Amino acid sequence: MTEVRMTSREARQECRVPFSGFVIHSSFSRRWRSGSALIAVFWMIAVLGMVMFTGAKALQADTDYTRTMRGRIFAKRYAEMGLELARHPAIQHDDPLLHFSSNDDGGYNVTLVSEEARLNINHLLQTGDKVLLRRLFTRWGFKPEFTAALYDALIDWVDADENVSLNGAEKREYEKAGLEGLPFNRPFKEVEEMLYVRGMDIVNTERPDWREWFTVFGSGMVDVNDASAELISLLGDVPMERVQPLLTFRAGRDGTLRTQDDQRLASVPQVAQMLGVFNRQTVEQLTQWIQFAGPIRRIESVGSLGPLQRKLILITQGGQAIWRGELPLHGKDS
């Protein structure tokens, strides 16, 4: 026999691998395994990239949350600073100390107004005054049926009995809605309680600033020297443009409210004349609804840090605090 010798290179070239009925050269098998490994590497890179991206986004979200919470805390601190400063009896509505800005883009702005420059919800309901509330809800765009039902539900909330008004809601109606222990059948102790009344959730959605219109303190007569233009328009039942002469008078010569030259309204005939109201019934209503120097003080302090703001309220009477809380700032980062 003739011995055949092959070099190692020739042997490798002649080595064959059976695969599915085909004979594959070893060089092709090696390239196939290398390609599979490369694909696996690409997959690992993609997975690691996704993990790193997710981690980075989570870290960014955590950082943003921490920054926001820090900003809210400092904004509230500034608001508290303004609130405590404004409590001093010597501070007047035009005092420059009511406004402060710091080097860290923070600060506070404080406003001193009469708490009675709002509608006293308890007084309106207990005296059976349907005119102002229905007029208000109608101006806010609510239909007459909803307005009537909401008014009756408010009446049922503050009266002492369990008799249901025509479109109102007492214990049974609230229980059907899954709400136990309602209504309280007593006057509102604070404005926020109004949110529990059936229908007020809709008002809260459509008019999130509704809290700014009401109070539970005072005699029930609105202080027109601090009342908003919208509220004065409501009281006089006149369009907004008719309120402008009154606003101009209050602002004084410099045209800026809450400065030293501000002027104060003093009588119902003066208010009626500026509003262009000469109807006897309307003048009589104004006599019942308005006053000119409410004794209850409302301190509104807005603290800020960058775009973040917090609004704190302190209500005082005779130098004593009777309510303190925080209200949302609508249309602002808070």
Model-derived regions: residue spans:
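Compositionally biased linear targeting/interaction segments
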Residues: 36-334
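N-terminal leader/signal peptides at the extreme start of proteins
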Residues: 1-34
